[in-house]
Amino acid sequence: MAKRNAVVVTHTRLRQTGTVVAEAVSQLRVAGFEVAIIDNTEAPDFGVQPPCVSDDTEIVVVLGGDGTILRAAELVHCTQVPILGVNMGHVGFLAEFESFQIDEAIRRVSTHDYSIDERMIAHVDVWLPGATKPIEDWALNDITLERADRGKMVELSIRVDDVEMNSFGADGVIVSTPTGSTAYAFSAGGPVMWPNVKALQLIPLAAHALFARPLIIGSGSTFTIDILDDSMSEGWICCDGRRQRALPQGTRVMVRESRDTLRLARLSGVPFTNRLVSKFDLPVVGWREHARNEASSQSLHHGHTFPAAAYAAGVAVAVAGDAGVAGTDPDKPGERDGKAGA
């Protein structure tokens, strides 16, 4: 019988304070897996690829929130090993199961009862002034280029396929994948992109300009962002809220679709739309309908009343029933990582 290998990725706090990690590891071993545990969430340096899990790893099970999943993504980026997220955080957009379903998750993993969802990754080349080759990195969620000096603006020029589109002073810009469109990009006013869309979006952050709106490009195009030589501030680049470094004036940053993808294990066929409504608790009943229901609860219709509260509760139950469980997280570095990717 072939050896089956699994890796459990979690964070130190969860491993030290709870029994969930021990329970998951025990169940995987009972199912015939040899299990390695990784709880080091320290971010590698920008442009440095940390050691990946071995190619004979069958699956990486993540116990945590989306921040822990982003850490796990660094371990599988150079492999075809899928990630299964079990949400131990708050929203857990990338996770597939909730913590109380861990028994079911392990059972499904042990019987290969899951499908693979391939997610687009963004590739970034950073050309420092005078450099003959770029520093390369990548992101599952987003790449941010922000001001290094919090009291000054960073002056940027934006190009698409080598055609200049805009230039402005700003707090920075976000370049997001579809997966990251429900994270920092969403908070900054960007649109939600469905995960199967092959596109990248750029969202300016507090740009001092009359025309500074989000831009969406197709997968064959490239965003080029130059930090102008006379910029008041240097830049600061960060991939997925983890790998980061300072960028001097005159740096060029180029972002395009990566040839690689990230593989997420999916245990259900719940559509992304249901996940979006459920995780964001979207108000599917508009204010006008609420007002009508409030009015109708005060009067009788054919001898019956229809209280608005009961209606709203019914909608909530219906949404929860349709949404199933999908899977931001206190263990993420940085304030912005409280927003999950989808």
Swiss-Prot record:
Catalytic activity: NAD(+) + ATP = ADP + NADP(+) + H(+)
SUPFAM superfamilies for this protein: NAD kinase/diacylglycerol kinase-like
Active-site residues, Swiss-Prot/TrEMBL: D66
Signal peptide range: none
Keywords annotated in UniProt: ATP-binding, Cytoplasm, Kinase, NAD, NADP, Nucleotide-binding, Transferase
Biological process according to GO: NAD metabolic process; NADP biosynthetic process
Originating organism: Bifidobacterium longum (strain NCC 2705)
Enzyme Commission designation: 2.7.1.23
Family recorded in the similarity comment: Belongs to the NAD kinase family.
Cofactor: a divalent metal cation
Binding-site positions, NAD(+): D66, G67, R71, N141, D142, K152, D171, T182, A183, Y184, A185, F186, S187, A206
Function: Involved in the regulation of the intracellular balance of NAD and NADP, and is a key enzyme in the biosynthesis of NADP. Catalyzes specifically the phosphorylation on 2'-hydroxyl of the adenosine moiety of NAD to yield NADP.
Listed GO CC annotations: cytoplasm
Gene that this sequence comes from: nadK
Enzyme superclass (EC): transferase
Compartments in which it is found: Cytoplasm
Annotated Pfam families: NAD_kinase, NAD_kinase_C
Protein's UniProt name: NAD kinase
GO molecular function: ATP binding; metal ion binding; NAD binding; NAD+ kinase activity
InterPro entries hit by this protein: ATP-NAD_kinase_N (IPR017438), ATP-NAD_kinase_PpnK-typ_C (IPR017437), NAD/diacylglycerol_kinase_sf (IPR016064), NADK (IPR002504)
Coiled coil: none
Highest taxon of the lineage: Bacteria
Taxonomy of the source species: Bacteria, Bacillati, Actinomycetota, Actinomycetes, Bifidobacteriales
